[in-house]
């Protein structure tokens, strides 16, 4: 286990960042946030809660959950071990989905039951039913419709509802507000310090969701690959997504901004993503599984690495169009910008020529950081990149929705975004090929920069978001901590 670096260490690493003048380096030193203190030992658990072959323990702001067995067994362990967290996450999602869509909860239950459930593979139907059974065994009264809708918490409100509104001529919600999520890169070959694949990702979402997106799943299914991934309580896919498999794949993504499209006859994205992580043993396998029954939900640019070959890929998965770029010597970055001209033209309202947009500003910053550090990129630098607060549009240091470490609550002028919206980077994860071989990665809860979010102060300053007060909590930044498959609870120091 590894804790957060010192402020001096962060500053010395920043000096390596290319394209930065001495004057701006001085400004960076002043602006560099002090790392959040390590989570109190009282937040770590020294005993494990078990259920059959499954177990859980708390560490540094994360909940580590091991699941093993048949599909129903895995689901049952998941539901039983995480019952309090699933009930809490469900309340948050229900409030967010109904408030933002103007639809009641029964609308989402019906969509889950009638549109999504019939197309879910039997294996995952059994796992979802297992979650419900485990919840109910642990005195949590959620049913199958609730859990299927929760698993589709990205795609039903943000893709299906806008599509349905467009079919009925109802006003649509801004695509930027719903789809501007995540920053990530993957690099290989001469670009990295040891010619290993290096992959990093920060999850961007509402702080309501992000404060709860703190599960490390270690899943040993009856068939397919073992998987270690971050995740959300009650959801069978990683969903932000970040994971590594015994099949040799390193997997992450960022959403395609301004995307519009939905196929009600297709298979839910959370099912396809989980299946691809579990069964793909190559980049080609992954692409094939994701394209089968594509419903357009949660359309992403996937960044995939095969540690067995050193090859990396960018897989842009639209509904009408899909394209794959591959290399064994280079990098791909993601910040919600589509790259395929066909996807841009036919499936989005994205403007690639607007430097003030969040996706484009972050794309420029990725290019600066990755090009400027060719040959030196490793997991240590990746942590620093994810914490970056340089706005390429204003040419100033200052966290907002245009910076790699996003802080929507500090933003009032980014086009297409609601002022001071409590959304942004809510976790960071990094790994390299050597770590991937051990099913191992390093993760941090909260903002990758180390700044904590104070919910009470925010709601006092911005009462327009008071509707979130029942579920909006503080979001503390934990230390960078290493997790691997098969971990057990740490013992207290003697």
Identify the function of each model-found stretch.
Residues 1-6:
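Positively charged n-region of N-terminal signal peptides that target proteins for export
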Residues 311-353:
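Extended amphipathic alpha-helical segments with heptad-repeat/coiled-coil character used for oligomerization
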Residues 25-284, 291-297, 303-326, 355-494:
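N-terminal mature-domain region immediately after signal-peptide cleavage
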């Amino acid at each position: 286990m590894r804790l957060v670096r010192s402020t001096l260490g962060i500053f010395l690493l920043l000096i390596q960042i290319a394209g930065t003048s001495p004057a701006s380096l001085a400004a960076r030193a002043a602006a560099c946030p002090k790392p959040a203190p390590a989570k109190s030992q009282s937040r770590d658990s020294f005993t494990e809660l078990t259920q059959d072959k499954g177990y859980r323990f708390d560490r540094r702001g994360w909940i580590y959950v091991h699941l093993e067995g048949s599909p129903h067994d895995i689901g049952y362990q998941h539901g039983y071990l995480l019952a309090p967290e699933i009930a809490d996450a469900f309340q948050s999602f229900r409030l967010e989905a109904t408030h933002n869509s103007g639809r009641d909860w029964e609308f989402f239950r019906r969509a889950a039951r009638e549109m999504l459930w019939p197309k879910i593979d039997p294996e995952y139907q059994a796992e979802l039913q297992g979650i419900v059974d485990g919840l109910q065994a642990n005195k949590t009264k959620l049913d199958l419709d609730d859990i299927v809708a929760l698993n589709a918490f990205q795609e039903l409100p943000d893709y299906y509802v806008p599509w349905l509104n467009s079919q009925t001529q109802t006003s649509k919600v801004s695509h930027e507000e719903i789809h501007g999520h995540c920053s990530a890169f993957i690099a290989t070959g001469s670009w990295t310090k040891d010619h290993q694949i290096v992959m990093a990702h920060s999850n961007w979402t509402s702080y309501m969701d992000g404060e709860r997106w703190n599960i490390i799943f270690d899943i040993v299914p009856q068939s397919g690959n073992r998987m270690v991934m971050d995740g959300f309580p009650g959801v069978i896919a990683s969903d932000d997504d970040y994971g590594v498999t015994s099949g040799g794949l390193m997997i992450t993504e960022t959403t395609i901004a301004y995307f519009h499209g939905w196929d009600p006859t297709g298979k839910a994205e959370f099912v396809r993503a989980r299946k691809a992580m579990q069964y793909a043993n190559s980049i080609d396998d992954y692409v094939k599984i994701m394209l089968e029954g594509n419903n357009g939900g949660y359309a992403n640019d996937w960044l995939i690495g095969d540690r067995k070959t050193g090859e990396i890929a960018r897989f842009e998965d639209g509904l009408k169009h899909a394209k794959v770029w591959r290399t064994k010597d280079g990098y791909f970055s993601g910040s919600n910008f589509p790259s395929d001209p066909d996807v841009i033209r036919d499936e989005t309202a994205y403007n690639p020529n607007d430097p003030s947009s969040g996706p484009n500003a972050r794309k420029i910053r990725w290019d600066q950081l990755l090009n400027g550090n060719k040959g030196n990129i490793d997991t240590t630098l990746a942590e620093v990149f994810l914490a970056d607060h340089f706005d390429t549009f204003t040419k100033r240091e200052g966290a907002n929705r245009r910076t790699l470490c996003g802080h929507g609550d500090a933003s009032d002028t980014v086009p297409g975004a609601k002022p001071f919206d409590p959304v942004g980077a809510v976790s960071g994860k990094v790994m390299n090929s050597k770590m991937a071989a051990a099913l191992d990665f390093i993760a941090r809860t909260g903002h990758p920069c180390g700044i904590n979010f104070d919910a009470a102060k925010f709601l006092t300053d911005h009462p327009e978001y008071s509707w979130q007060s029942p579920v909006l909590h503080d979001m503390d930044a934990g230390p960078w901590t290493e997790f691997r498959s098969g971990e057990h609870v740490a013992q207290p120091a003697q």
